[in-house]
């Protein structure tokens, strides 16, 4: 996903709007790439079904926030640092722009 415009930023916020997906990202962020977690481990830690975890991972993966790597017969997931940093920069940039607009409006009054 390319986070260069407002529609992409809105899509990112939509992906992050689900509490389970945020919990998944936090769990995965605590891991290092070699210590990625499989669906079963994530489901156990979150107390949700493997099916629910798989669906949420699919959304996170399609947004580019998570990567999967096959290890044996399981896929282990980890944070995609590059995309996460890009998304963070885009959000920060958008928020700074909003601050400048707000400052300009308050000066006009």
Predicted regions and their residues:
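Amphipathic alpha-helical dimerization/coiled-coil segments
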Residues: 1-9, 26-33, 81-109
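N-terminal helix-turn-helix DNA-binding core of bacterial DNA-binding proteins
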Residues: 7-49, 71-83
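Histidine-centered divalent metal-coordination motifs
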Residues: 21, 55-56
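Alpha-helical residues within the helix-turn-helix
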Residues: 44, 55, 61-62
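Short, Lys/Arg-enriched C-terminal cap helix and immediately downstream tail that follows
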Residues: 64-66, 72-73, 88-89
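Divalent metal-coordination and catalytic microenvironments
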Residues: 53, 60, 77
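Intrinsic low-complexity/disordered segments
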Residues: 47, 52-53, 85, 104
């Amino acid at each position: 996903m390319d986070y260069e415009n407002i529609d992409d930023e809105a899509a990112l916020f939509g992906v992050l709007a689900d509490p389970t997906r945020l919990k998944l990202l936090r769990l995965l962020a605590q891991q290092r790439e070699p210590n990625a977690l499989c669906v079963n481990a994530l489901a156990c830690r979150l107390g949700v079904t493997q099916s629910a975890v798989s669906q949420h991972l699919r959304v996170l993966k399609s947004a580019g926030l998570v990567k999967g790597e096959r290890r044996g017969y399981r896929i282990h997931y980890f944070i995609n640092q590059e995309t996460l940093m890009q998304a963070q920069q885009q959000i920060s940039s958008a928020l700074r722009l909003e601050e400048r607009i707000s400052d300009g409006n308050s000066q006009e009054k």
